[in-house]
Amino acid sequence: MDYINAIGRRKAAVARVYLSEGSGKIVINKREIEQYFPSSILQYIVKQPLLKLDVAAKYDIKINLRGGGFKGQSEAARLAIARALVKINPDDKPALRSEGFITRDPRVVERKKPGRPKARKRFQFSKR
């Protein structure tokens, strides 16, 4: 196995994942996961599909992350890793889907409308 690649998106974040057989090392934008995501919660979000299938020490993962914030980036990486694992073994898809790792979250920021200060907010209305 050379390497498997997959893309995951969440909000404004895009994650490109390259999965290869190895010892469980995760590198994000040329930095270790502990340095890129200091929060253990965000590290856990990224590792969730690997822990669910119990293959955390089986693959080395290289991730390129762009755009968005920390939370969006971690969830984009989670989706990309889940998609890559399904490419390797399609039998894992039901287990990952039941946890919601395969589903792309479609919620994105609503655009600002003209004639309003924000997407939904209106300027103060004066009756008289």
UniProtKB/Swiss-Prot annotation:
PROSITE patterns assigned to the protein according to its UniProt record, in alphabetical order: RIBOSOMAL_S9 (PS00360)
NCBIfam families: PRK00132.1
Pfam families: Ribosomal_S9
Residue segments, region Disordered: 106-128
GO cellular component, one term: cytosolic small ribosomal subunit
A Gene Ontology biological process term: translation
Entry protein name: Small ribosomal subunit protein uS9
Keywords noted in UniProt: Ribonucleoprotein, Ribosomal protein
